Regions:
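Conserved donor-binding loop and adjoining core beta-sheet/short helix segment
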Residues: 1-46, 168-179, 187
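A conserved beta-strand-loop-helix scaffold within acyl/acetyltransferase catalytic domains
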Residues: 12-19, 125-179, 184
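Acyl-donor-binding surface of acyltransferase catalytic domains
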Residues: 29-99, 242-244
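Glycine-rich phosphate-binding loop
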Residues: 31, 136, 190
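Conserved acetyl-CoA-binding loop-helix of GNAT-fold acetyltransferases
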Residues: 33-46, 186, 192-209, 230-231
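Conserved hydrophobic beta-strand within the GNAT/NAT acetyltransferase core sheet
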Residues: 55-59, 181, 215-219
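Conserved active-site alpha-helix within GNAT-family acetyltransferase domains
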Residues: 60-78, 197, 221-238, 246
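A short beta-loop-alpha structural element at the N-terminal edge
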Residues: 100-115, 121-125, 238
Length: 250
């Protein structure tokens, strides 16, 4: 919590992971004013340096752009939350006969990590510097560290002629008791055949069968998937927020 005298004016979370400090969950009451946001940024930089961290990564609402930009933060991407009903009338369109969709398992972790690295390469969602980072994130999702994993609603797509690389994948878990789609990804060579829409619809239909009426996701603004989600009935459910990074001089 953030306090002004005896009055709470906001909240945030500050923690460390490896050589990086992280600041997220920043919410300020309107009466706090822009000066409080600037103080938060300055204090986070001081604490990061005191911890000998090399980077400070921050996630914050777009309303605080000026305070972070003024201290040298470089914007990585803009994201927004979206929500949709799982009761959707669109049918599952047939896929090419060479593709097979099945429920994913822990044995798929390495291949899903490879798929995510290939799918996000060169784009704003390419957040891990190496394959190990992607595989670690997939393992964390399946192990429930983002919220209880829902295996019945998580799928991979395989190509009959390539057993070493996945064509697509989608994962789902609970976030505050609401299903969340995490990393809908399609390999570059299998785009524009309807695979992304197929996986998304399959997950939404399975969630509906399990009694979940809504599903959420977070998407980077400006990527093609944003339009896909709109077609599937997703609407923006919150403000745009920024993910940014600043190097720390220690």
């Amino acid at each position: 919590m953030l306090w002004r005298d005896d009055t709470p004016v906001g909240r945030l979370r500050f923690y460390a992971n490896g050589d990086t400090a992280l600041l997220d969950g920043l919410v300020l009451l309107p009466e706090a004013g822009g000066s409080v946001a600037a103080q938060v940024v300055s204090e986070a930089l001081v604490r990061s340096a005191a911890l000998n961290k090399r980077h400070l990564n921050a996630t914050y609402p777009a309303a605080y752009i000026a305070s972070f930009a003024a201290t040298g933060f470089q914007e990585l991407r803009r994201r927004t939350g979206m929500i949709a009903s799982t009761q959707i009338s669109l049918p599952l369109s047939p896929l090419p006969s060479s593709l097979r969709v099945r429920q994913l398992s822990h044995d798929d972790i390495d291949q899903i990590g490879t798929l995510l690295q290939r799918a996000y390469s060169g784009g704003p969602d390419n957040l891990h510097p190496d394959l190990a980072g992607w595989r670690a994130e997939v393992r964390a999702i399946l192990d429930g560290r983002f919220g209880p994993f829902i295996p019945e609603c998580s799928f991979v797509a395989e190509h009959t002629l390539d057993r070493f690389h996945l064509a697509g994948s989608i994962m789902a878990h609970l976030e505050r008791n609401v299903p969340r789609i995490h990393h809908l990804a399609v390999a570059p060579s299998f785009r524009h055949v309807g695979l992304g829409q197929y996986l998304d619809l399959k997950t939404m239909q399975r969630l509906q069968e399990l009694g979940h009426s809504t599903v959420i996701l977070y998407v980077t603004l400006g990527i093609p998937a944003f339009n896909l989600y709109h077609r599937l009935g997703f609407i923006e459910a919150g403000p745009t927020y920024i993910e940014a990074e600043r190097k720390i001089n220690v």
